Amino acid sequence: MGVSFSKLFSNLFGHKEMRILMVGLDGAGKTTVLYKLKLGEVVTTIPTIGFNVETVEYKNISFTVWDVGGQDKIRPLWRHYFRNTEGIIFVVDSNDRSRIAEAREVLQRMLNEDEIRNAVLLVFANKQDLPEAMSAAEITEKLGLHSIRQRPWYIQATCATSGEGLYEGLEWLSTNLKNQA
């Protein structure tokens, strides 16, 4: 009984660590999201060729966030980051209507991978500060999110440069990752 109680106590009050994979098309704002969460400031970025990894602390949880480059030629490498991934953050450029179908295809293909079948999905509808940005509801439809039945998912409107919506997304992740444990 002591072991059960200590595990329960740890689950309720202890410090958790969670592995998060952040992906999306190139130019969606993944690296800007990562460093806004980590440093609280906007950093100058260049296209990510490999990956960035940082630990973001939020509400007694250490999120180890792997930000992986989104260029077409790099996407096949994403699968090398799938092992032990508990949550996926898929970042979408809400202002880029010309690539939303490509984003849907990439997301659907990735979600079919067996190694991440138990990972929860958070979609950041990024760049909401731009006047032509699609709403979270429109992106939900265009990505076909309502057809996802095998995992918990959530979409959050965000603006990585201001930080708007980022912590709301982490809040959803922390709640849903606790439920998975």
Curated annotation (Swiss-Prot):
Main location: Golgi
Compartments (UniProt record): Golgi apparatus
InterPro entries: Arf1-5-like (IPR045872), P-loop_NTPase (IPR027417), Small_GTP-bd (IPR005225), Small_GTPase_ARF (IPR024156), Small_GTPase_ARF/SAR (IPR006689)
Keyword GTP-binding on entry: yes
Keyword Metal-binding: no
Entry's Gene Ontology cellular component terms: cytoplasm; Golgi apparatus; plasma membrane
Keyword set, alphabetical order: ER-Golgi transport, Golgi apparatus, GTP-binding, Lipoprotein, Myristate, Nucleotide-binding, Protein transport, Transport
CDD domains: Arf1_5_like (cd04150)
Sites where the protein binds GTP: 24-31, 67-71, 126-129
Lipidation (N-myristoyl glycine): G2
GO biological process, any: intracellular protein transport
MF (Gene Ontology): GTP binding; GTPase activity
Function summary: GTP-binding protein involved in protein trafficking; may modulate vesicle budding and uncoating within the Golgi apparatus.
Family statement: Belongs to the small GTPase superfamily. Arf family.
Record-given protein name: ADP-ribosylation factor
Lineage: Eukaryota, Fungi, Dikarya, Ascomycota, Saccharomycotina
